[in-house]
Amino acid sequence: MSADEDNKEQVLKECEQAEEIMKDKQNQKLISEITKENIQLKEEIKKLEAELQETTRTSQINEDIPETKIKFTSVENPESDSEFSDISYSCQVSSKVPYELQKGQALITFEKEEVAQNVIRMEYHHVQVQNENVMLTANPVSLNSGVKFQVHVGVSKMKINVTDIPDELPESQMRDKLELSFSKSRNGGGEVEYVEYNKQTRSALITFVESGVADKILKMKDYPLYINQNCHRVTVYPYTETHLKKFQVFSGVSKRTVLLTGLKHLQTTDEEVVEDFISIHFQREKNGGGEVEVVKCSLGQPHTAYFEE
C-alpha cells in the first residue's frame, strides 16, 4: 500500500508540475500577445496623432473678430480672378544698429526724450559711486547707418510649383503629360490653363483655371505623375511672389539714450553696482534726470549695444 501511495503522490506531483508548465507557457503566450497588441496600439496612436497634427495645421482657425465699421467707396473690376483670390501679406523690417561701448563708458536710456536732452545740455554730472565721487560727461549717441523696408508676399490661389519631375520625356511631351495629370479630378486636380516646364531644373509652374484646385493639391504635399505605367511622386508647394518696397537708409542720433564717459579710473569692477548708482542718480529730478529705462556700462571689455529706429 505504501508503494502505491508513493506512486500516486509522484504521479500527482508530475501532473501538477505539468499543469504549472502549461500555465507558464500559456501566460507567456498571453503576455507575448498583449505586448504585440500594445506595440500595434502605440503605432496606431502615433499615426492618429500625426493625422491630427496635419489636420490642425491645415484647418482654419475660427476666432471672434471685433466689429468694424466699413464704408463702401467704389466698385473695382479686376483684370483677372486671381487678383481677389490670392493671399497677400506684408511686414516692416528694420535692422538693428550696433554701437560699441568702450571701457569707462556707459549708456543710459530715459523714458522721455526731453529728459535725455536736458542731461546732455547739463553736460557734467557729479555721481556718487559707493565711496567715490565721479565726474561724468554726457554726450549724444551718434549711430551708424541702418536700413528699413517693407516685404510684400503674395501667395497664389491659382498656381502651384512642382519639383522632382523625372527626366524621362522630351520637353514638349512632359509639358503635355503634366497638363493631363494635373487636370484629373480623381487625383484632386482641375482644368489647367498653362504649364511652364523647365527641363534643366526638373520643375514646373502649373496655372489652373479655377481657384480652389491649388489648395486641394497643396494639402497632399506630393502628387502622382504616371509615365510609362510607372507612378512618380512629384513635390508640390505654393507659388509666391516677394517684393521689397520703401527701402530706406537711416542714420542719426539717439533721442532717448545718452553716452556717459569718465568711468575709467573707478576702483570697483562690478558693473551692476555701478549701473545701480548711475540709475539712482539720474532718476532724481534735482539732478536733471527722470524715469530711467536701462543703464549699461563697460568697466573692462567693450560691449556691443543694439539700437532700433
UniProtKB/Swiss-Prot annotation:
GO terms for biological process: innate immune response; macrophage activation involved in immune response; negative regulation of cell population proliferation; negative regulation of innate immune response; negative regulation of non-canonical NF-kappaB signal transduction; positive regulation of inflammatory response; positive regulation of innate immune response; positive regulation of non-canonical NF-kappaB signal transduction. The keyword Cytoplasm applies. There is a cross-link at K23 (Glycyl lysine isopeptide (Lys-Gly) (interchain with G-Cter in ubiquitin)). It holds the Pfam family NID. Signal peptide: none annotated. Ubiquitinated. 'Lys-63'-linked ubiquitination by TRIM21 promotes interaction with IFI35 and inhibits virus-triggered type I IFN-beta production. Keywords: Coiled coil, Cytoplasm, Immunity, Innate immunity, Isopeptide bond, Nucleus, Secreted, Ubl conjugation. Residues 104-193, 202-294 form the NID domain. The keyword Mitochondrion does not apply. Its main location: cytoplasm. Residues 23-65 form a coiled coil. One of its GO terms (cellular component) is cytosol. It is found in: Cytoplasm; Nucleus; Secreted. Belongs to the NMI family. Acts as a signaling pathway regulator involved in innate immune system response. In response to interleukin 2/IL2 and interferon IFN-gamma/IFNG, interacts with signal transducer and activator of transcription/STAT which activate the transcription of downstream genes involved in a multitude of signals for development and homeostasis. Enhances the recruitment of CBP/p300 coactivators to STAT1 and STAT5, resulting in increased STAT1- and STAT5-dependent transcription. Interacts with MYCN and MYC, as well as with other transcription factors with a Zip, HLH or a HLH-Zip motif. Interacts with all STAT proteins except STAT2. Interacts with IRF7, the interaction is direct and leads to the inhibition of IRF7-mediated type I IFN production. Interacts (via coiled-coil domain) with TRIM21 (via the SPRY domain); the interaction leads to 'Lys-63'-linked ubiquitination of NMI. Interacts with IFI35; the interaction is direct and is facilitated by TRIM21. Interacts with TLR4; the interaction is direct and leads to NF-kappa-B activation. The coiled-coil domain is necessary for interaction with TRIM21 and for TRIM21-mediated ubiquitination of NMI. The NID domains are necessary for the interaction with IFI35. The NID domain 1 is necessary and IRF7. This is N-myc-interactor.
